[in-house]
């Protein structure tokens, strides 16, 4: 201090010659003098420079000169003055010749420089914006505690009278230090001009004082707010820049790319050297090197480079915590020595009790700081890895997309990323428990001598068993993840293709397939869990075996006596060893899971990407008349391993040209556009595009946003141009009818729009782009005749908005070819011919063959004109005045309702009030605590008998544990005769028997919880799947797919793993708490007085915490659903995103969604630490109470009983803290059960099968269909979409159904298949009302070929014969009939060929023919074709028509068509208008009437 006391007497620093009064002190006066003088300066000079360097690089602006800062500076300068005066006095005395020890000059000088450094730190902190300093807080605390203790002992020894001036100076300095310490507990004002931008709701951590940060009291405001009212997202704090995705992902991506490049160079060098040294063996080594060196290692290294500082800081906190952890056994040894010796004064026992309390508190604070740092690291790593996965999704090549379905990607971000980040908490568990074990053995050696060596043998003998178990668990874990992927992929396909499944009545078959995979998944999970239980019990048994063997050897072999100090200090050390041995299997278990997930992530991140060098592109555009697109001798393949799909393409397209691409199904039309986009792998050749590119895919992709955001697609809003685009794309009337106009949300996957509206919206997005090159993949296929003609004339054609731009149009509409500047005919992946329309007609080559196929055979008399003769000028007439007026009249003559209201729009109205609970893009959120019914639902799923059995087993093993500890206390109190205990063998034998019984009960109880959890998982998943699959089609149209996928992936994983794990831990710790409370109450009854208030405080903390934590968990789940939905949406539209060069805006959107999810996760993270820190601090009070009560009752208690009580009290802090945490975690996890039950009460479809109905096989025999005054509405509050429809279709009759968009054509098919139930009237088939027939019975007797052909992930045979009702011969015959036999025979595996999700590896025409083959195999009496030929070329359409005429000649056929050409062969045509049958008759009769059908034929160019 400024005025140090006299130096130590005697030799050295430590005084060994204290007088008798001081000898009774636990700490010598010389130690206090030395520590008080040197420890605070050493502390500041060691940490101060590091702290200065840190704040120099992490400044946050600067602080104003506040009153708090001024007070600190005044006190600091006052301390400097006092230290200076002490130095001056010492120098003056030396100058006067007064004999003084050197310490009287050295000590004040050291304190003077240290105080000056402290003042400098205070000033620097203000400059760098530090509001509260932990380093100075610790310094002022040390400056007060150690010198104050020294001064107090000197004062009690009459040292004050020896030099009153120096001691007055000391007390004055102590007073100033106390004032500085108090000020250091306060936080200064926020920084002025901070480097981070101002946030709307900043996290209070940055402005909290150091004590508040250490105890996490800055979280209390949020917890209290959550207790008073439900928390909302706006109540949560903003996310700091250091935690933002933009910052984290960019850093990780940069390091990863750098490491990958270095690894590739290294591997190439090694491969080159090995090739030179071993000849042909080099290629064998390269895959190994590529797998081991260039995949997982660079990513792991990058993660370490980015996040190592946070991890090391947390590890340092953990090491300091462990120092205090091992201080407790030493203090306990001294305490039991004090209890056993009646001579020492009572204050010594109280001092030891205080020291144990302080050590436990410091252990708590540092341990919670470690957990906080690692949790923050976990959150940051999650953001970074999710960002990497998202960026990879945007860069996947076509071959990689086939290998990774949407469900796989969702599984990666929802499960694998979570498991990988959770492993951060257990990384130190691989080495730190080993250090604990070594330290424990050192303690045991000190206590028991050579007998402790036997513990090493027992422990090491069990290690091979655990390594073997870990290896087996790894195998089963990988199997479970494989099955999880298969289930996720199939479940995703079911949810996305629910309409197709319901069309065919396949729900039951898909349920069986999913549940079969689920059964294998749970089987692997059960086996893995049982192995984990064996591992955990083996570690528990190893602890007991160590104690048993050590005690037995110590007492029986070495013939030593047991006493309380040996028994219970050993027991305390073994409890630490128990934690180490429990932590180790948890760490191994977590890291085994993380390794599997990490390998899967690395495999995905290393998939093949789109090569940006395939196309030589320029955004500047080309001059008029110059070539805009050039392809020279180019050959393309879908991936580097697959055979070429386009051969020797040579093509030059000048700027402003309209190029039409035609050809049969599978000719390579869409592949050509993909090649121009750079989506294909270029085998050879050259490709160049000048100017910005816009792309319209064949299958429209839209975002889950508003109409205007879909059209603008990240560009600035230009209202006049937007209006022109919407009008040209025939969207303006639709938009006008939407409830919020252009700001109306269209729902996920455009579920509020029809297929035609989605296609026009996709086209409008491209047109709005004002690009130089437009790649249009059959955009007119999903549009009816008049809308398609309008769109072509107004947008694509020579007089449209895109005139002057380069347009490559893939089309099957041959009647528009005369207006194209140039035509390419593709066949078998090569250009068959190209030229102008007239040139190709004159050649009479491939184009003429297509026109001949498209020309209808026979003399029908409809007056259909050949496309070549529809206009005199192949380019000019559409741009003239007269055709423009005719088109305008044709559009305006249609009533507004017909033009704007699609059937899908009618099905799911955008202004539906019921949709308020299901907004697009937002998940449902419950508020308040989880209801008891949810807990009961889970327990019922487990089974009441199994629940009671598990509780009984836990009780039995805990009774055995109590008896074992009590028996040890009796053993310790046995008197020794001749240095030995006569009953040692009996005591040891019963001790061992009780331990074995406890181990058996522990394994049985954990196995019971595990098996019960697996049973509950199976039932809850089965109910969720059943509830979703049994829902009507409207449920899928209004529920975002991401919300469903989240429940089938993340929530299911929580129910599978987290709930059984938390339940097992809760029961273990709850019964352990009962044991500890009983021990303390029996041994030291006075401690009961402290136990009851502590329990009340614990209950208060839990009540405050649980409500907020559960609500935060719900908000977190809902926010993460948005991340999954956006990830899935981007995966499906990545080609469009790349084509428009909008990767950066999409990455920004993903960053915003992930940041929002993390903004909600962070409060839950720190709330956990708030609970743990404060609950453990309260629990440490029980240690103090038990020790204090033991001192008070020292005369009445045996040493063994006191040891039993205090050692148990030392465990109550961790035990009670884990009870609260596991209960809270269990309630947080049980939210997943609540979310899985969200759809249990939604409306369901009619029964699939009815036990008694008239529709028994062979119904229907004839296929007669009769609509009687049929009416249909899609919602109860909506008007009828179809009304008053009455007609009869005779058995075997082929009837066409036509009409404008929204006329009600597809509604008739929906009513016939009962996708929507009749609102009035009904439908009869062969005289049987379909309302009296089960849904599956009805749908299995009707075949439908929908507009969008869907294939499911799985074999081709499964897609054709899902119910396995047909032989291979029958399937091959059906394929031959649809002319796909040769194609399938060429595929790898043939019928066992694995189809990609939604059949993306096949063309639309090929998929349509496969659907036709599927209908051939079903052999039903009724067939519905719902726009089945809209997306196929005329040749394929004629092929399908011919098969309908031959194979379905005896069937009743309903042909819903856009192309009137398709219905000209029908015996009768129904013309729908405004939901009613407007006209009915043969095509010739309807044309002669010159009514609505005639006008439609005019618009189609047929008359």
UniProtKB/Swiss-Prot annotation:
SMART domains in the record: AAA (SM00382)
Stored InterPro entries: AAA+_ATPase, ABC1_TM_dom, ABC1_TM_sf, ABC_transporter-like_ATP-bd, ABC_transporter-like_CS, ABC_transporter_C-like, MRP, P-loop_NTPase
Annotated ranges, domain ABC transmembrane type-1: 311-593, 947-1228
Matching CDD domains: ABC_6TM_MRP1_2_3_6_D1_like, ABC_6TM_MRP1_2_3_6_D2_like, ABCC_MRP_domain1, ABCC_MRP_domain2
Biological process (GO), any one: response to xenobiotic stimulus
Membrane topology annotation: Multi-pass membrane protein
Protein's cellular compartments: Basal cell membrane
Official protein name in the record: ATP-binding cassette sub-family C member 6
Impact reported for residue 21 to S: Found in patient with putative diagnosis of PXE; uncertain significance; loss-of-function mutation; localization comparable to wild-type
Keywords for this protein: ATP-binding, Cell membrane, Disease variant, Endoplasmic reticulum, Glycoprotein, Membrane, Nucleotide-binding, Phosphoprotein, Repeat, Sensory transduction, Translocase, Transmembrane, Transmembrane helix, Transport, Vision
Signal sequence bounds: none
Superkingdom per UniProt: Eukaryota
Reported impact of residue 766 to D: In PXE; affects protein expression and trafficking; expression is reduced to less than 10%, when compared with the WT protein
Effect recorded for residue 948 to P: Found in patient with putative diagnosis of PEX; uncertain significance; loss-of-function mutation; localization comparable to wild-type
PTM notes: Glycosylated.
Effect after changing residue 834 to T: Found in patient with putative diagnosis of PEX; uncertain significance; loss-of-function mutation; localization comparable to wild-type
Transmembrane region(s): 32-52, 73-93, 99-119, 132-149, 168-188, 303-323, 350-370, 427-447, 451-471, 534-554, 576-596, 940-960, 998-1018, 1062-1082, 1084-1104, 1176-1196, 1199-1219
Cofactor: Mg(2+)
Binding residues annotated for ATP 1, in chain numbering: 663-670
Glycan attachment residues as annotated in the record: 15
UniProt effect for mutating residue 663 to C: In PXE; affects protein expression and trafficking; expression is reduced to less than 10%, when compared with the WT protein
ABC transporter domain: residues covered: 629-853, 1265-1499
Regulation: LTC4 transport is completely inhibited by 1 mM orthovanadate.
UniProt effect for mutating residue 1459 to C: In PXE; putative autosomal dominant
């Amino acid at each position: 201090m400024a005025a140090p006391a006299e130096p130590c007497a005697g030799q050295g620093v430590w005084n060994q010659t204290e007088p008798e009064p001081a000898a009774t002190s636990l700490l010598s006066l010389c130690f206090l003098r030395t520590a008080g003088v040197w420890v605070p300066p050493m502390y500041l000079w060691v940490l101060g420079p590091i702290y200065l360097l840190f704040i120099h690089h992490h400044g946050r602006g600067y602080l104003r000169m506040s009153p708090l800062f001024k007070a600190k500076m005044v006190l600091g300068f006052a301390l400097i003055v006092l230290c200076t005066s002490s130095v001056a006095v010492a120098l003056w005395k030396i100058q006067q010749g007064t004999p003084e020890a050197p310490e009287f000059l050295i000590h004040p000088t050291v304190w003077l420089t240290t105080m000056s450094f402290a003042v400098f730190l205070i000033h620097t902190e203000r400059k760098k914006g530090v509001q509260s300093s932990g380093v100075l807080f610790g310094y002022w605390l040390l400056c007060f505690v150690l010198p104050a203790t020294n001064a107090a002992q000197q004062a009690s020894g009459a040292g004050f009278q020896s030099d009153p001036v120096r001691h007055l100076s000391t007390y004055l300095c102590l007073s100033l230090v106390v004032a500085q310490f108090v000020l250091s507990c306060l936080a200064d004002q926020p920084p002025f001009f901070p480097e981070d931008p101002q946030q709307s709701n900043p996290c209070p951590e940055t402005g909290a004082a150091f004590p508040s940060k250490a105890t996490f009291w800055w979280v209390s405001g949020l917890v209290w707010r959550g207790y008073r009212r439900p928390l909302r997202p706006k109540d949560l704090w903003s996310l700091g820049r250091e935690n933002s995705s933009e910052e984290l992902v960019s850093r990780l991506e940069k390091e990863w790319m750098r490491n990958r490049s270095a690894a590739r160079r290294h591997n190439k060098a090694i491969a080159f050297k090995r090739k030179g040294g071993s000849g042909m063996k080099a290629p064998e080594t390269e895959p190994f090197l590529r797998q081991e060196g260039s995949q997982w290692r660079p990513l792991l290294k990058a993660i370490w480079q980015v996040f190592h500082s946070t991890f090391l800081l947390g590890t340092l906190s953990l090491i300091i915590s462990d120092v205090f952890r091992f201080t407790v056994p030493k203090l306990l040894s001294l305490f039991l020595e004090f209890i056993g010796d009646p001579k020492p004064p009572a204050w010594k026992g109280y001092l030891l009790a205080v020291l144990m309390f302080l050590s436990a508190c410091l252990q708590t604070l540092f341990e919670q700081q470690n957990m906080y740092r690692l949790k923050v690291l976990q959150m940051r790593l999650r953001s970074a890895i999710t960002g990497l996965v998202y960026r990879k999704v945007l860069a996947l090549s076509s071959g990689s997309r086939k290998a990774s379905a949407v469900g796989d990607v969702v599984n990666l971000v929802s499960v694998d990323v979570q498991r990988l980040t959770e492993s951060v908490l257990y990384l130190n568990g691989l080495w730190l428990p080993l250090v604990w074990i070594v330290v424990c053995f050192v303690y045991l050696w000190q206590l028991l001598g050579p007998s402790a060596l036997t513990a090493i043998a027992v422990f090491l003998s069990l290690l091979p068993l655990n390594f073997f178990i870990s290896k087996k668990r790894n195998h089963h874990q990988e199997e479970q993840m494989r099955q999880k992927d298969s289930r996720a992929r199939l479940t995703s396909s079911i949810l996305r293709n629910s309409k197709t499944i319901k069309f065919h009545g396949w729900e039951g078959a898909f349920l069986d397939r999913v549940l079969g995979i689920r059964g294998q998944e749970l089987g692997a999970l059960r086996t893995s869990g049982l192995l984990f239980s064996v591992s955990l019990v083996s570690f528990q048994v190893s602890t007991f075996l160590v104690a048993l063997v050590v005690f037995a050897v110590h007492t029986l072999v070495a013939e030593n006596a047991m006493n309380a100090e040996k028994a219970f200090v050993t027991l305390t050390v073994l409890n630490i060893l128990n934690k180490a041995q429990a932590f180790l299997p948890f760490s191994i278990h977590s890291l085994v899971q993380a390794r599997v997930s990490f390998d899967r992530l690395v495999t995905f991140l290393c998939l093949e990407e789109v090569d940006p060098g395939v196309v030589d592109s320029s955004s500047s555009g080309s001059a008029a008349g110059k070539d805009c697109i050039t392809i020279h001798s180019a050959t393309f393949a879908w991936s580097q391993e697959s055979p070429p799909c386009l051969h020797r393409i040579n093509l030059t397209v000048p700027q402003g040209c309209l190029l039409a691409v035609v050809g049969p199904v599978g000719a390579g039309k869409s592949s050509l556009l993909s090649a121009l986009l750079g989506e294909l792998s270029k085998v050879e050749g050259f490709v160049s595009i000048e100017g910005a590119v816009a792309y319209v895919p064949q299958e429209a992709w839209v975002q889950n946003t508003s109409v205007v955001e879909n059209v603008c697609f990240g560009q600035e809003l230009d209202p006049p141009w937007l209006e022109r685009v919407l009008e040209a794309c025939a969207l303006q009337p639709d938009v006008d009818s939407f409830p919020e106009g252009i700001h109306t949300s269209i729902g996920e996957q455009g579920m509020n729009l029809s297929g035609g509206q989605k296609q026009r919206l996709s086209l409008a997005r491209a047109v709005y782009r004002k690009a130089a090159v437009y790649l249009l993949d059959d955009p007119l296929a999903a549009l009816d005749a008049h809308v398609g003609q309008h769109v072509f004339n107004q947008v694509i054609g020579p007089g449209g908005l895109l005139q002057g731009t380069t347009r490559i149009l893939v089309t099957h509409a041959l009647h528009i070819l005369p207006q194209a500047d140039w035509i390419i005919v593709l066949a078998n992946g090569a250009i068959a011919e190209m030229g102008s329309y007239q040139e190709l007609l004159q050649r009479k080559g491939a184009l003429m063959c297509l026109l001949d196929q498209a020309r209808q055979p026979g003399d029908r008399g409809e007056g259909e004109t050949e496309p070549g003769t529809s206009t005199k000028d192949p380019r000019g007439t559409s741009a003239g005045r007269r055709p423009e007026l005719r088109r305008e009249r044709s559009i305006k003559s249609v009533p507004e309702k017909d033009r704007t209201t699609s059937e899908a729009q009618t099905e799911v109205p955008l202004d539906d009030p019921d949709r308020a609970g299901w907004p697009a893009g937002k998940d449902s959120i419950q508020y308040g605590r989880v209801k008891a019914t949810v807990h009961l639902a889970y327990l019922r799923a487990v089974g009441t008998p199994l629940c009671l059995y598990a509780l009984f087993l836990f009780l039995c093993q805990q009774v055995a544990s109590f008896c074992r500890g009590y028996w040890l206390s009796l053993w310790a109190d046995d008197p020794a005769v001749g240095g030995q205990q006569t009953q040692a063998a009996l005591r040891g034998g019963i001790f061992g028997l009780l331990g074995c019984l406890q181990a058996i009960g522990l394994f049985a109880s954990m196995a019971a919880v595990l098996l019960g959890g697996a049973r509950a998982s199976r039932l809850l998943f089965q109910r969720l799947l059943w509830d979703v699959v049994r829902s009507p089609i409207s449920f899928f149209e209004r529920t975002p797919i991401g919300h469903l996928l989240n429940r089938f992936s993340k929530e299911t994983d929580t129910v599978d793993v987290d709930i059984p794990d938390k339940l097992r831990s809760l029961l273990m710790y709850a019964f352990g708490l009962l044991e500890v409370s009983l021990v303390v109450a029996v041994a030291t009854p006075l401690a009961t007085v402290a136990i009851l208030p502590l329990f009340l405080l614990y209950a208060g903390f839990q009540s405050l915490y649980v409500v907020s934590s559960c609500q935060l968990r719900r908000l977190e789940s809902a926010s993460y659903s948005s991340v999954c939905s956006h990830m899935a949406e981007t995966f499906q539209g990545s080609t469009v995103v790349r084509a428009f060069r909008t990767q950066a805006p999409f990455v920004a959107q993903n960053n915003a969604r992930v940041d929002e999810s993390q903004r909600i996760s962070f409060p839950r993270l720190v709330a956990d630490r708030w609970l743990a820190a404060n609950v453990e601090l309260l629990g440490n009070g029980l240690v103090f109470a038990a020790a204090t009560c033991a001192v008070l009752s020292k005369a009445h208690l045996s040493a063994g009983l006191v040891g039993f009580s205090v050692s148990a009290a030392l465990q109550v802090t961790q035990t009670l803290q884990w009870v609260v945490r596991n209960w809270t975690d269990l309630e947080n996890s049980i939210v997943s059960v609540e979310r899985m039950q969200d759809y249990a009460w939604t409306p369901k479809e009619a029964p699939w099968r009815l036990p008694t109905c008239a529709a028994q096989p062979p119904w229907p025999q004839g296929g007669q269909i009769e609509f009687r005054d049929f009416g249909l509405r899609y919602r109860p509050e909506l008007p009828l979409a179809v009304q008053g429809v009455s007609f009869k279709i005779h058995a075997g009759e082929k009837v066409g159904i036509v009409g404008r968009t929204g006329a009600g054509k597809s509604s008739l098919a929906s009513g016939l298949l009962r996708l929507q139930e009749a609102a009035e009237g009904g439908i009869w088939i062969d005289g049987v009302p379909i309302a009296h027939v089960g849904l599956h019975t009805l749908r299995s007797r009707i075949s439908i070929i929908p507009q969008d052909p869907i294939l499911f992930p799985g074999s081709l045979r499964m897609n054709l014969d899902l119910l396995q009702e047909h032989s291979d011969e029958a399937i091959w015959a059906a394929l031959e009939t649809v002319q796909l036999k040769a194609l399938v025979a060429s595929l790898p595996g043939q019928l066992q060929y694995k189809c990609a999700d939604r059949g993306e590896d096949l063309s639309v025409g090929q998929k349509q023919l496969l659907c036709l083959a599927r209908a051939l195999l079903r052999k039903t009496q009724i067939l519905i074709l719902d726009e089945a030929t809209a997306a196929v070329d005329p040749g394929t359409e004629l092929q399908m028509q011919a098969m309908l005429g031959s194979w379905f000649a005896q069937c009743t056929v309903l042909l819903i068509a856009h192309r009137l050409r398709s219905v000209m062969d029908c015996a009768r045509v129904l013309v729908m208008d405004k939901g009613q049958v407007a006209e009915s008759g043969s095509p010739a009769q309807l044309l002669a009437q010159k009514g609505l059908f005639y006008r439609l034929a005019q618009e189609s160019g047929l008359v």
